[in-house]
Amino acid sequence: MTMSSFLINSNYIEPKFPPFEEFAPHGGPGGGDGAVGGGPGYPRPQSAPHLPAPNPHAARQPPAYYAPRAREPSYPGGLYPAPAAACPYACRGASPGRPEQSPAPGAHPSPAPQPPVPLGHCAPGPTTPAVATGGSAPACPLLLADQGPAGPKGKEPVVYPWMKKIHVSAVNSSYNGGEPKRSRTAYTRQQVLELEKEFHFNRYLTRRRRIEIAHTLCLSERQVKIWFQNRRMKWKKDHKLPNTKMRSSNTASAPAGPPGKAQTHSPHHHPHPLPGASTPIPSSI
């Protein structure tokens, strides 16, 4: 009776709470209370603001770390297709428990992955827009490599010594292939005239004179020596003279003839009998 009179006479105001539906998942054994125990005497915590339920049919936006990377403009899109297994839910917009849903009307559909292209060919990938600076997108690297080393200025390609063709004689086995075949020297009319004048006076040159002629005619000492060798062979052929080298080799290789038979004479043998010498007369029987 005392308790009932206290409740009637006191200014105690009974608190009002939200409906039971909002706190049903978080309520304790006391029913609609948000605190453990659910007694009416306990102070109740402030309730969280009411959030609307998510729409299950709305398209889920993929997180930032699942977003596909933007392709760089230097590579065509056909060479590097985006892997489909990297973002299965972000690309399809569905979770394992929900069926696949059509994309939202404002979202752009992701392009379908293209099949890989062999390395030897250049696929015509999607045309990338021009760069903001005004330059066009770079072309295929394979096509740029096929244009050759000559640049836009028309420069000649660089030819290194190892790229030149070397004439190697198959007969000479001791040839190591380091020196190319010597080209034939083309003498000018002035050089030939001076060499002919020198040959008219001296068919054989000393080393000092050969060096002087080579320096005067802008030739090498070897070229002057070879020219005089060839000119001497021509002169001998014109005068029908035997080759000096062949004659010397023939005389050296010819065997010596058989020596004459030496006659041996005995000191007591006389081919003719001396006068007054008596010849032995055979005795007759």
Swiss-Prot record:
SMART domains named in the record: HOX
Disease: Overexpression results in abnormal gut development (megacolon).
Comp. bias regions, Low complexity: 44-70
The organism's taxonomic lineage, starting at the top: Eukaryota, Metazoa, Chordata, Craniata, Vertebrata
Function text: Sequence-specific transcription factor which is part of a developmental regulatory system that provides cells with specific positional identities on the anterior-posterior axis. Binds to sites in the 5'-flanking sequence of its coding region with various affinities. The consensus sequences of the high and low affinity binding sites are 5'-TAATGA[CG]-3' and 5'-CTAATTTT-3'.
Localization of this protein: Nucleus
Name listed for the protein in its UniProt record: Homeobox protein Hox-A4
PANTHER family linked to this entry: HOMEOBOX PROTEIN HOX-A4 (PTHR45771:SF2), HOMEOTIC PROTEIN DEFORMED (PTHR45771)
Gene behind the chain: Hoxa4
Keyword DNA-binding: yes
Compositional bias annotation for Pro residues: 106-118
Residue ranges: DNA binding: 180-239
